[in-house]
């Protein structure tokens, strides 16, 4: 079965075999070697200076990393502006509300790109320490323009907290601009690991001021203990095995730029084939990521018909969310997928929509 949902992904055999490594106590030096390698490779993935940046690992989904980031890095006297244009921006608002973090929301329609003028106007009203934004909003497949948002923040001295859960490892992220304090992400999307290992790439200067609002996801404590080759709790050891093996593969294949190019070729192939079959891209050309794209359901064919028919042929696609569930479907090209797989997928669409 090939998974065309936005994580978990279809694994390579090499990563799958890594799950068969010997059982390992998380208090032994061998585990801390594994933890150290994962952290070092994550920082190196975007060629970051380890004196300025660190990777903090945790056991959980990508949402755990996002929650840890938001809970720790908005100071008690700070204020957060959440940019919403999909389900995952709304989730950050829910996290901020749950923790009692001072925040406002700049809400957009799900099909809308963030309005830079509105962001600037909100920030000009004053009082904001941070902006939270989703890099790749998988609700629609939109790649929000981090660079443009960063420019708005930079002139106003506001830092960014980025949900990079479904972009880290495949899309460009400008860590060098000085505007980003942290990016939250996970092993089981663009890095091709398995669910259970998540992380925050965080600026050390921001980490030094981290608030402690949560017990299990306390970013400052996790970082401190990991720097000491320690861990506060039992991690998902085999998920760490898989993450390290996936990162080795990632580096050997050419890093995020090579992964971006591979995803783009597959996504463009799928997009062209689906358009020819009457299923156009939902967003305007150039607004989608290379990771996932959303398509209009064909006239007279339900999502359930497509899903079940394609699953019988060995493919899992993904439904639209919320009010979009009757309008669109989504296809991700993450994981161990090749051009021949996309061609077989398109043949399946032909059979189901004729």
Roles of regions detected by a PLM:
Residues 113-169:
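Active-site phosphate-binding strand-loop segment of PLP-dependent enzymes
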Residues 10-11, 188-272:
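Active-site C-terminal subdomain of aminotransferase-like
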Residues 83-101, 109:
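Substrate-binding/gating loop at the entrance of the active-site cleft, primarily
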Residues 42, 52-81, 89-92:
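Conserved beta-loop-alpha segment that forms the PLP phosphate-binding cup at the N-terminus of a helix
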Residues 176-188:
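Conserved active-site segment immediately N-terminal to the catalytic lysine
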């Amino acid at each position: 079965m090939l998974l065309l949902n936005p994580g978990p992904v279809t694994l390579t055999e090499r990563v799958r075999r890594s799950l068969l490594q010997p059982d390992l106590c998380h208090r032994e030096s061998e585990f801390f070697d594994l933890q150290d390698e994962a952290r070092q490779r994550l920082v190196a993935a975007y060629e970051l200076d380890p004196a300025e940046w660190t990777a903090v690992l945790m056991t959980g989904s990508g949402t755990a990393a996002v929650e840890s980031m938001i809970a720790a890095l908005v100071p008690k006297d700070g204020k957060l502006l959440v940019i919403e244009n999909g389900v995952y921006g709304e989730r950050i608002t829910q996290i901020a509300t749950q923790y009692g973090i001072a925040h406002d929301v700049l809400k957009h329609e799900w099909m809308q790109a963030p309005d830079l003028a509105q962001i600037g106007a909100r920030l000009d009203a004053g009082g904001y320490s941070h902006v939270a934004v989703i890099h790749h909003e998988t609700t629609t497949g939109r790649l929000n323009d981090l660079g443009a948002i960063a420019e708005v923040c930079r002139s106003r001295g506001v830092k960014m907290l980025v949900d990079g859960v479904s972009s880290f490892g495949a899309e460009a992220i400008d860590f060098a601009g000085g505007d980003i304090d942290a990016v939250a992400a996970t092993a089981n999307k663009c890095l091709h690991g398995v669910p259970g290992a998540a992380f925050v790439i965080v600026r050390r200067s921001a980490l030094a001021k981290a608030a402690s609002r949560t017990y299990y996801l306390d970013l400052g404590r996790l970082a401190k203990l990991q720097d000491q080759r320690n861990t506060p709790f039992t991690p998902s050891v085999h998920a760490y095995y898989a993450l390290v093996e996936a990162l080795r593969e990632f580096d050997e294949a050419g890093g995020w730029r090579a992964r971006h190019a591979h995803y783009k070729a597959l996504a463009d192939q799928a997009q062209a084939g689906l358009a020819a079959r009457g299923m156009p891209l939902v967003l305007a050309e150039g607004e989608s990521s290379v990771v996932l794209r959303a398509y209009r359901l064909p006239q007279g064919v339900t999502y359930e018909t497509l899903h079940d028919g394609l699953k019988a042929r060995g493919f899992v696609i993904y439904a639209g969310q919320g009010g979009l569930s009757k309008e669109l479907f989504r296809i991700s090209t993450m994981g161990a997928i090749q051009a021949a797989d996309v061609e077989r997928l398109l043949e399946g669409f032909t059979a189901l929509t004729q």
